[in-house]
């Protein structure tokens, strides 16, 4: 990176503008984004995001704040919680966590003290880093006991997991996570953890939009005591966290600690954008979630047909938005992800169940998600095209720069955000609109 002349502030501003614009063009117009943990907001939600709320605080709970000037965010936060909860079958909702990790931490800390045990899948079996001794769980001093995992079926080994829970008697267990292509056995694990006096947390960060759209089982209906999540993956809103509760006592305990333990300012500007996205999900969520899961299966089939080793063939490859590919024979996850990035196809390298944790920098697999390209209007035909482009890079060893040009042409057809309110007559003045009127 070329050094900036720090004595010339204008040159720094121009460089900042250049880098930001180049990123926007690259990721929004020229790339196929297949990162499983990302998505794009609608233009309508984006307008709601660009508000004066980004400058403001609202410590505490709605209508019981420690700051004045919160009359509108109070109403919006309650409304958003009702919208989100209505799609999860609960009115016990916390939207103040600013990320999925903070959502997890807020529940973990209430359920366990340092030295207590929790049964959770290891990170190479799909757990999020916040579930591990390397992340939030370890920072809280909670001991991770690895949940038995069935590598062949890419899922929890139910019989062994139940036996372990009965032996260990942990304070809580966690299902869900960062890589999972099939629903976890929520009922069975809930029964086991409840029998020893513990609680079940389901990390639905990746599948929240699929649950709301009816394409994934609702963990609250299957015994989970709390469902944590983020609002920017299959739920296509702004970055943020959320917790949904079945257990009212747990809700009250966690809610009391969100402020001041975990957040002071909970980033108010994301709340109206989350509300707009929730309305979009109520209107279009079933069609969207159905197309996402259908696209994922089609992409998996197409990749396999092109010669890639897609995990889960005997079970239909996937029921989520994710496709997992074993690329050991193609140079490993780090090399493959890098080659695809050079080709403007964005995926991430990922540990697979047989990898040791220390292989995190060069794991066996790549993880692919189709939720964003689905929102751009892509369907089965486009999944076949994407599979061909990936084959050109990883198997045929074509020049990534040439493939990148093909990707740019391909993306020109998909610039509109679907399953959104963008084609409705919804007027939302952004903060820039308001300020320009005052000039």
Curated annotation (Swiss-Prot):
Pathway: Amino-acid biosynthesis; glycine biosynthesis; glycine from L-serine: step 1/1. The modification N6-(pyridoxal phosphate)lysine is found at residue 233. It comes from the Archaea. It is an enzyme of class 2 (transferase). One of its GO terms (biological process) is glycine biosynthetic process from serine. Its main location: cytoplasm. Catalyzes the reversible interconversion of serine and glycine with a modified folate serving as the one-carbon carrier. Also exhibits a pteridine-independent aldolase activity toward beta-hydroxyamino acids, producing glycine and aldehydes, via a retro-aldol mechanism. Homodimer. This is Serine hydroxymethyltransferase. It comes from Aeropyrum pernix (strain ATCC 700893 / DSM 11879 / JCM 9820 / NBRC 100138 / K1). The gene is glyA.
């Amino acid at each position: 990176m070329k050094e900036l002349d720090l004595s010339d502030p204008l040159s720094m501003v121009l460089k900042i503008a250049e880098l930001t614009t180049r990123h926007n063009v690259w990721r929004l117009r020229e790339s196929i984004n297949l990162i499983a943990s990302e998505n794009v907001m609608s233009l309508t939600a984006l307008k709601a995001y660009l508000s004066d709320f980004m400058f403001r605080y609202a410590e505490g709970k709605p209508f019981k704040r420690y700051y004045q000037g919160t009359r509108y965010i109070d109403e919006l936060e309650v409304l958003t919680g009702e919208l989100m909860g209505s799609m999860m079958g609960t009115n016990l909702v916390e939207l103040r966590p600013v990320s999925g990790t903070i959502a997890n931490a807020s529940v973990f800390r209430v359920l366990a003290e340092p030295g207590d045990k929790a049964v959770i899948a290891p990170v190479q079996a799909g757990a999020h880093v916040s579930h591990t001794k390397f992340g939030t769980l370890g920072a809280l001093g909670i001991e991770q006991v690895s949940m038995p995992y069935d590598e062949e079926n890419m899922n929890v080994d139910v019989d062994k997991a139940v036996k372990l829970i009965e032996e260990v008697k942990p304070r809580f267990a966690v299902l869900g996570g960062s890589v999972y292509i099939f629903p976890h056995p929520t009922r069975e694990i809930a029964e086991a953890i409840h029998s020893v006096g513990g609680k079940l947390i389901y990390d639905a960060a990746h599948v929240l939009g699929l649950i709301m759209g009816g394409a994934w089982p609702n963990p609250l209906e299957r015994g989970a005591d709390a469902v944590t999540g983020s609002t920017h993956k299959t739920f296509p809103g702004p970055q943020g966290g959320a917790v949904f509760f079945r257990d009212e006592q747990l809700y009250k305990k966690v809610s009391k600690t969100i402020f001041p333990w975990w957040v002071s300012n909970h980033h108010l500007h994301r709340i109206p954008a989350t509300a707009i996205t929730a309305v979009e999900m109520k209107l279009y969520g079933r069609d969207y979630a159905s197309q996402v899961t259908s696209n994922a299966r089609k992409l998996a089939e197409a990749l396999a047909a092109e010669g890639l080793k897609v995990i889960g063939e005997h079970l239909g490859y996937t029921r989520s938005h994710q496709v997992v590919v074993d690329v050991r024979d193609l140079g490993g996850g780090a090399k493959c992800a890098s080659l695809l990035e050079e080709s403007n196809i964005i995926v991430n390298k990922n540990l697979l169940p047989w990898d040791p944790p220390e292989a995190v920098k060069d794991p066996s697999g790549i993880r692919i998600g189709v939720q964003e390209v689905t929102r751009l209007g892509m369907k089965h035909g486009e999944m076949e095209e994407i599979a061909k482009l990936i084959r050109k890079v990883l198997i045929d060893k074509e020049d990534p720069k040439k493939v990148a040009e093909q990707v740019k042409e391909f993306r020109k057809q998909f610039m509109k955000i679907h399953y959104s309110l963008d084609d409705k007559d919804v007027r939302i003045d952004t903060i820039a609109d308001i300020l320009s009127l005052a000039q």
